[in-house]
Structure formats: C-alpha cells, structure tokens
Design a protein with these regions (language model features):
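Short, charged alpha-helical interaction segments and adjacent helix-coil junctions
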Residues: 1-18, 73, 80-85, 171-268
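Low-complexity, glycine/alanine/valine/leucine- and proline-rich hydrophobic stretches
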Residues: 144-153, 158-163, 173, 177-180
Length: 268
C-alpha cells in the first residue's frame, strides 16, 4: 500500500516528544539535550552527561528483561533512565521499582563491592497526574521511618507530571515536550534537534521507523474498513431476506446495535 507523502509530512509535523519513538530520536546521542532535561527535572545544574543511549535492552535469563527508552550516564558514574509514560498502567510504581533493580544488577559487575554500586535515577514523565495530588514532581527516596532520616542507598525514583506546564523551568520543559514546532521550543537544545529531524532530508530519513509504523497503521485501518464494509453488506442482504436483527448480527459479525441501526435506515 502506497502512503500519501503529504499525509506522512502531516504525521511528522505533528510529532512531539511525548511520542516515545520521537523522544528517542530527539535524545539519541544528544548529550546537550539529555543534560538540560536532567538538570531541570532534578534541579541540579552540575549534572554533566557523558553519554546517552536509547532502547537499551537489558536481558535477564532468569526472569523479566527490560528495554530502557533512554539511558544516560554522567561524569560521576550515575545512571539516569528516562521513560515517557502515556498510560497510568505504564507508570506503575512496581514497574519503577523493577527498572531500578534492573539498573542495579546491570551496573554492579561480578566480584565488585556493594559500595561501588552507582547511584541510579528512574524518571517517569507521565501524561497524567498518576498520584492525583496536583504536584509537578513526585520524588521518591527510601527513608528510615522511625527517625524520618534518609536511608541514602543511592536509589531515586522521580515521577514528572507533564500536566504542570507553568512558567517555571520545569513547566517550560513540559511545554516543550508537547510542542510540535521547533521555533516555539523554549530550550535551544531541543529546538536544534527538532529542526534537523523535521526540516531536513537527512533528519526525515532517521524517522523511517515512525513513518513505517504510520503506514502500517493506515494499512491496518484500511483492512478493518474493508472487513466492516463486507459485514455491512452481509447484514443488509440478510435483512432484505427477512432475517431477524439477531440472526443478521450473528452471521455478519456486527453488533446487534449496529444491525438495528442498519435496519432503521432501510425503513426510512
């Protein structure tokens, strides 16, 4: 199936960083963009990202494996995993806990002392306010409950509520995550990359996977429409032969309500 190039351009122009695949392309090997994102979210201007990778697959031969959307490392050897979660289910607190454990097992090599375990940050940027408290950030650390003191094990989980898009540094960052136009982005580190991806031939070529996924979705939708059209024809034929609505629904694979609407249209 040939996809209309104009439609593809519309898809590309409508992409924002809240799209996982596009976010990955925006940050892949883009140290400056990853760095500004982490500095703003963690309120730490001293973070200096050394490298950033996307779609890092970490295999566990004895249990559940994980594919990390964005994984960055800074000059202190700390690891930062950033995930965009569009659904509340994807932002499960136990998923965050699991991802934290994945980083621990991956980056403490055999025969090394436990004190050499690097600090890790799991950052979930959520489309919804999953905790429903209206806060822009939910920072999670272990504490000793009896004396309300930090446990200080170097493990951090942060939920970022992307609904909070005010005029603070974090709010402007969240605005950028939803923005589709390079010229309207607040942070130049994102603007330069988006300009490249959306407005250059080379950048467009890097979005092959997104374009192919779009074409696949179009093809699947067309196939569904073809099947539905055939089902409607079967139902109308059965109704014309005097069959009941229930009978027509059963043999056309349409719902009873759909067939009832078809029957009503026939009589008007």
């Amino acid at each position: 199936m040939q996809t209309d190039y104009k439609l593809i351009r519309q898809v590309i122009e409508g992409l924002s960083m809240m799209n996982n695949k596009f976010m990955n392309l925006m940050l892949n090997e883009n140290v400056s963009a990853a760095q500004i994102m982490l500095r703003v979210i963690l309120k730490d201007d001293k973070i200096k990202v050394k490298n950033v990778r996307i779609q890092r697959f970490i295999q566990n031969i004895y249990g559940h494996s994980a594919q990390l959307d964005i994984l960055a490392e800074d000059g202190f050897g700390r690891y930062f995993n950033v995930e965009v979660q569009r659904s509340d289910e994807g932002a499960s607190v136990r998923r965050a806990r699991f991802y934290s454990s994945v980083l621990d097992t991956q980056f403490l090599q055999a025969n090394r002392d436990y004190n050499e375990l690097p600090d890790s940050y799991i950052i979930f940027i959520t489309e919804n306010d999953v905790f429903k408290k209206g806060l822009p950030l939910y920072s999670v650390e272990r504490v000793i409950k009896e004396e309300s003191s930090d446990f200080s094990d170097g493990s951090y989980i942060v939920y970022v509520n992307s609904n909070c898009r005010d005029n603070t540094a974090l709010g402007r960052l969240m605005q950028d995550l939803y923005c589709t136009e390079p010229a309207k982005l607040h942070y130049k580190e994102f603007a330069e990359r988006m300009e490249f991806l959306k407005c250059s031939k080379e950048g467009e070529e890097k979005m092959t996977d997104i374009i192919e996924l779009y074409a696949q979705n179009v093809a699947e939708q067309a196939a569904k429409e073809t099947v539905h059209k055939k089902s409607v024809e079967v139902a109308l034929s059965l109704l014309a032969d005097g069959m009941s609505i229930d009978f027509a629904a059963k043999h056309s694979k349409l719902t009873v309500e759909e067939v009832r609407r078809l029957a009503e249209k026939r009589t008007t």
